[in-house]
């Protein structure tokens, strides 16, 4: 079994893919499902998200997303896991579009057999689910920030890799070795996330609570899983697994 870590999304994923955007899209996605959402729809663009609202009518779906860390005009929510954790989404469908994470999920879905969303908050559950599904390879895909490698995602990939290596034997690539090295040398999760460039950006926007929330490890058993039967090139449907 191969274990691969892509420090940025590259594509060509033949088996299981764990998409990581710890600050903040995949952390927020896990929280939406924890708080009762029936499904998450990750769109290719904000315009597609707004179109889904128009098609569904008032109250049909809720929109969450950001650009540059700030809420998208016309959306109901930003991309804040703290904000999401304070809501009740029971029975609702949440449509998401973000700067980095939703795009990484779309790249993964082009070829991946099983696509999961992973964060620190669900790291143990995501690793177990990935191992159970995999037949030849698990790829951990870091979303990065504006096409640049993000310390926070590589750190989270290292946490996931540690869990996976505890579950069985893998042939690891250089990306996995880099992620494991970062995990072992970047301090505790909050220190790693807070010292990252994107973490500092969010703190500067007054979103330090989101960074602290995202630094929690294995507090959730929810793993968003792509429902390939109800997915299109512009809209990916994830449900809790």
From Swiss-Prot:
SUPFAM superfamilies documented for this protein: ComB-like
Cofactors required: Mg(2+)
GO molecular function (one): 2-phosphosulfolactate phosphatase activity
EC number from the UniProt entry: 3.1.3.71
The UniProt record lists the keyword Magnesium: yes
Pfam families xrefs: 2-ph_phosp (PF04029)
Primary enzyme class: hydrolase
Keyword Membrane tagged: no
Catalytic reaction list: (2R)-O-phospho-3-sulfolactate + H2O = (2R)-3-sulfolactate + phosphate
UniProt entry keywords in alphabetical sequence: Hydrolase, Magnesium
UniProt family annotation: Belongs to the ComB family.
Protein name as catalogued: Probable 2-phosphosulfolactate phosphatase
UniProt source species: Deinococcus geothermalis (strain DSM 11300 / CIP 105573 / AG-3a)
Gene (UniProt): comB
